[in-house]
Amino acid sequence: TFHTRKTNELQIAIVDEAHRLRKKSGMFQNQGEDQIKEIINASIFSVFFIDRNQRVTFNDAGTIDKIRNFAQEQNSLIYEGVLESQFRCNGSDGYLAWLDNVLQIAETANYDGFEGDYDFKIFDNPHEMYDAIKAKNKINNKSRVLAGYCWDWPKEGRMTSLVKDIQIPEHNFGISWNLGNSDTYAIDPDSINEAGCIHTTQGLEFEYVGVIIGDDLRYENGKLIVDINKRAKTDQSIKGIKKLLKENPEEAQQIANEIVKNTYRTLMTRGQKGCYIYCTNKELSNYFKLAYNHQLSYTYNEPQVILSEQPLAADKTNSNIDKLNLKLDK
């Protein structure tokens, strides 16, 4: 943390994953000022690496606009650049662009598929996906199963993979969340018996990943549905959204939409050579199949978010945009 640093105390500060910066420092986020402001103040030269599509918790507060604003407040010179090349997902820019479009994170030209040798598969049975990942993992222990945070992670049983936290009853499938010693998840051979969550696997890379997409992302009546209610009660990443909903519904809907979609984008880009997916929602699985097999018509639209069971009193936007159902329990 930088809240105790003096002005220009550091020659240079290099901040990776700057999108994960918080509004304040400390365990309870109650110390100092905004972390971006503190870093700029404490450093003669600050470098921020940021990916706006990797915001996965309510408390992630790092944005390009905030960096610009705080830098301007301190009369700093601002230099902006874009990292054009990337090595993630076998260097497949096409896969990343396609994924952004199919998740409706960004409008790209790859709405109907992608070129290249990235190994992407959609499974109708979680057992079959798991078997495929285990077969890959036998080669060099570099493949893992990951999952959206739609299943609780109770304190009891966190140190044994015999407790199957993630249950898909229709397939009689179960797997435990990653154990409490998550620091070794990427290298421990026993981790193949566990499913990694977003908080454990963000920043990690494997050769192959199998991703279980839960009911917080569905496809219904031709619409992508984001449903925060389907997130686990033990998920701290959405803590604060209900309060914000009362204060600023528009901002709450935007953040909820980002968290769910960015979570799956992050999980689905952890595999260097391939990504296999299983969707608990069959319609979403079919949607992915159509998009992957070049059979999906161009339907990208900016999302509208419905925050309750009742329709909005007055729709002042174009009504032909996607509806993302973010129903929040009381």
Language-model features, listed with the residues they occupy:
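Conserved P-loop NTPase catalytic core
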Residues: 1-136, 141
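Short, flexible loop segments at the rims of nucleotide/cofactor-binding pockets, characterized by
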Residues: 23-28, 188, 251-254
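Short secondary-structure boundary/capping segments
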Residues: 27-31, 56-69, 97-100, 158-174, ...
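C-terminal accessory regions
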Residues: 45-47, 191-300
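Short, well-ordered beta-to-alpha junction loops that form the rim of enzyme active sites
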Residues: 51, 149-152, 280-281
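Conserved helicase/translocase motor-coupling segment
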Residues: 57, 61, 79-94, 106-219
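Structural alpha-beta junctions
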Residues: 69-80, 165-178, 295-303, 310
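Acidic, low-complexity intrinsically disordered tails
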Residues: 298-330
